[in-house]
């Protein structure tokens, strides 16, 4: 249900505590990713609670990567908790991958606040959430048929 996705990805997500079961995240993002029939989701996120901030980052990165898969493809979504840091990796694989430069700039903190618009708002939010406590966002590609977006959430 789109409303539940938007509440969890962008809002306060009432009904959820400070941690969220990743199965809830998968349940809200999978229909949005696979609904067009051109994109599949490979979910490699272990069970167990994740900080709500990490789940927001994960959901928004999946949506951003999905938008970059112009002709569909596969989204590989993984996450791991290591030494108190949540690592998130989204790998997009498809025949045509295009990431808008302004979205990439928003994700990496290279977009002026005055340039934020509806296309870049999610990236800007993800960057801000990741920066809390010294986290970061990294992007490799698009190159050929793939692109990787990683986040470190502290």
Question: Predicted regions span which residues?
Answer:
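Conserved DHp (HisKA) dimerization/phosphotransfer helix of two-component histidine kinases, i.e.
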Residues: 1-39
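Short hinge/gating elements
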Residues: 11-14, 44-48, 106-113
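Conserved short strand/loop->alpha-helix "switch" segment adjacent to the catalytic nucleotide/phosphoryl-transfer site
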Residues: 37-64, 70, 113-115
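Solvent-exposed beta-strand sheet faces enriched in polar/charged residues
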Residues: 42-44, 78, 140
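Conserved ATP-binding N-box helix of the HATPase_c
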Residues: 53-82, 122-132
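Glycine-rich/acidic phosphate-handling loop/turn and adjacent ATP-lid/helix
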Residues: 82-123, 152
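Glycine-rich ATP-binding loops of the HATPase_c
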Residues: 134-141
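Glycine-rich nucleotide-binding loop
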Residues: 143-149
């Amino acid at each position: 249900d789109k409303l539940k996705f938007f509440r969890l990805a962008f809002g306060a997500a009432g009904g959820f505590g400070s941690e969220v079961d990743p199965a809830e995240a998968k349940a809200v993002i999978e229909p949005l990713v696979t609904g067009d029939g051109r994109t599949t989701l490979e979910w490699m996120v272990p069970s167990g609670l994740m900080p709500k901030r990490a789940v927001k980052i994960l959901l928004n990165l999946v949506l951003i990567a999905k938008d970059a898969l112009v002709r569909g493809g596969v989204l590989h979504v993984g996450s791991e908790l290591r030494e108190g840091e949540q690592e998130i990796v989204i790998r997009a694989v498809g025949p045509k991958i295009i990431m808008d430069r302004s979205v990439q700039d928003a994700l990496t903190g290279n977009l002026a606040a005055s340039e934020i618009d509806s296309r870049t708002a999610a990236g800007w939010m993800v960057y801000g959430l990741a920066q809390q406590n010294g986290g970061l966002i990294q992007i490799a590609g698009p190159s050929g048929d793939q692109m990787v977006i990683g986040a470190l959430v502290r």
